[in-house]
Amino acid sequence: MDLNKFTEKAKSLIQSAQMKALGAGHQIFMPEHLLKVMLEDESGLVQDLINACGGNVQSISDAVDSAIKKLPVIEGPGSGGLQLSREIAKVFEDSIGIAKRNKDSFVAVERLLQGLTAQKDDTVGKILAENGVTPQKLNSVVAEMRKGSSADSPNSEEKLNAAKKYTKDVTELAMQGKLDPVIGRDEEIRRTMQVSLRRTKNNPVLIGEPGVGKTAIVEGLANRIVANDVPLGLHDAKVLALDLGALIAGTKFRGEFEERLKAVINELSRAEGKVILFIDELHTLVGAGATSGAMDASNLLKPALARGEVRCIGATTLDEYRQHIEKDPALARRFQPVFISQPTETDTISILRGLKERYEVHHGIRITDGAIIAAATLSNRYITDRFLPDKAIDLIDEAASRVRIEMDSKPEVIDELERKVIQLKIEAEALKKESDENSKQRLKKINEEIENLNSKFADLNSKWQMEKNKIARIQETAEKLDNARKELELVQRSGNLGRAGELMYGVIPQLENELKNQEKVTDSFLKKEVTGDDIANIVSKWTGIPVDNMMHSEKEKLLNMENEIGRRVIGQKDAIEAISNAVRRSRSGVQDTNKPFGSFLFLGPTGVGKTELAKALAEFLFDDQSALLRFDMSEYMEKHSVSKLIGAPPGYVGYEQGGRLTEAVRRRPYQVILFDEIEKANPDIFNLLLQILDEGRLTDSHGKLIDFRNTILILTSNLGAEIMLKGNVDSVRNEVMQIVKSAFRPEFLNRLDEIIIFHSLTRDDIYKIIDVQFSYLQKTLAKRKLSISLLQEAKELIAQTGYDPEYGARPLKRVIQECIQNNLAKLVLSGEVVENDELIVYALDNEILVKKV
């Protein structure tokens, strides 16, 4: 027998059957072994053929098992060989004959099954015939399955039912009610149908940003086809989604992929327009399956698409369409673009209302209308790098998931009681070892308290369990109601009016009333609904922008913001007030939403607190002064340094990395940005800042829009510092502003919220700054368990030595470092100072000294 005449699948089954025979200890290879292996085959081809003939796979399998058990078993030496029986040889001979008569080049699996049914006098033939699989029935089923095609390659089985193997039936899913409802999008669905009903090039391609609902439009079309709400040309049409992964998976040799795809195309061509092929991520076809010299999937599809033999709907993003499809004009002209725009906030709210019930059933909670409106508005305002409705749906889903987790977790009051009981039990165990009267009295009191708490815990716990059970029942009823509604749609389509009436007027109203009554029960423990606050909380988690409702403590903190920051930044009341007002405007929601929270130009001599105020603001907002995004503009003096901020242009090194400014803001949209010594920056950088200050956005080198509306921009400059030192701020303001106007363009200055001139520091300010700096030193030493205090005469000497109006507060830091920290370091290293020592800073003979108390 020449195995080369058989397909790869048939060969594999024959070899598996031989192994089965050897494994069972049989020396003769019988048809029973072959049929058993064919029935166990994972591809399911033989099972499908038997079912199509009206046979029962399980009863055939049981009968074959009984027949195999009756075969003689050989043990001992010489039992390892295997011979072909006369019966199996006849099966192969008949199979080859059937294949030749049907003009097949190779013997496929179905021909082997036909060969088995042809053995009318053998055990296998009788088993099959008794179960309804006769040669006549099988021949007609195989002919129907083959649809005139022949086995002309070693992998011909893969061509059979290729559409079923490599596609997913979207209309079938719609019929089963497994697709989410599609709300709106009527114009886009109508346009898709319009293109699909053309005579040639009837292939719409849905082009839109990720998440705008391209796939949903195809699902909406499938729902309409099922509901018969389509033009006559689309009645009884099927929408099949191509599974490119399944098409490519397992293609070991060149040509296998092309063979599979060609089989799908041929099968769709034979459907004569009754099947629409949906290709999600259409751009993946370009280059798919192509090896050196081989054609890719798109080239195989082109002829069928041009002639209108295959009706296709593609979906891809704008970028991918431009990058892959437009590069191939021959492919592009076969598709008709249908542009899918992002829905508006109002449309998104309608979409969410339509989907609400599905998410309520899945999570077993209620979603309020306030949550739906918040999801649409907050996602549109704060999540700028994604698109509606996808981002709004994700917000609803995650907020519902969070509420569900909270429901399943132990309530805080019960958890606290449980911990308290454990704590008291530990204390009671310790007291049992004591014999004095006080301990006995305390033990008695603890036992009473434990008993009391246990009783309280039992009551609350049973109440919680009851509430959980009620919620489980509500979810169960909601699921039953959802399934009843799906069933109603199915029976209405199938014309079973009796069952439809039963569902519509009996089951569904009963379940609705039941659900209403169950939801009436008020609960004290568990939160069962998603509100706008939950959505705001998720937005805050995603973006880091505090959009959730402020706690009372935060409101107090914001109202006293000047005092908080004033403890750290001394002598700059105007600047602190301007910054505080900007933060309050943004958090209270009265800020213009199309520009940054605040943009300020800080002017003043060196060392007066310009950079320190930016750090203090970052610490106030984020409890972390490193949350400040700082750019030293002395690094951006060259013309080409603009690319450091927004990213290198295409073709240059570093293009993939993005810009320092744009990437930082994209990842963390809520932060303080400091441009230090802005006058040193290249003039081109001001052109970038104009866009940020005016519109609150900037486009990076990749073409992505970066949102700066949730940032505070602070620019510092030393311009006019020498004039400020001559007199007070009010008297020199005009002179300083003239210098500023000559350095910066009017359109730049005009876009700033405020230009703040910092005061020179007075001697009183210096004393306060010494206190602030000394408190930092005290905190550092406290970590080493050392305490230090500063005497008044030492403070006055530090102020006298470190005060220089021209240099501001920076000399103070140097004096503290040289006179106090250097002496401290020597004392610590010499061992004179150890843990828990008290130190004092004093002045003697115009010298600042440190000693142990």
From Swiss-Prot:
SUPFAM superfamilies listed in its UniProt record: Double Clp-N motif, P-loop containing nucleoside triphosphate hydrolases
Entry keyword Cell membrane: no
Region of interest: NBD1: 161-342
Taxonomy, superkingdom: Bacteria
Region (Repeat 1): 6-71
Residue stretches making up the Clp R domain: 3-148
Major subcellular site: cytoplasm
Region (Repeat 2): 84-148
One Pfam family hit: ClpB_D2-small
Region of interest (C-terminal), ranges: 761-853
Subcellular location: Cytoplasm
GO terms assigned for molecular function: ATP binding; ATP hydrolysis activity
Binding residue positions for ATP 2: G604, P605, T606, G607, V608, G609, K610, T611
Coiled-coil ranges per UniProt: 393-524
Region (Linker): 343-544
GO biological process: cellular response to heat; protein refolding
Family indicated by similarity: Belongs to the ClpA/ClpB family.
Subunit structure, as described in the record: Homohexamer. The oligomerization is ATP-dependent.
Identification of the protein by name: Chaperone protein ClpB
Source species: Wolbachia pipientis wMel
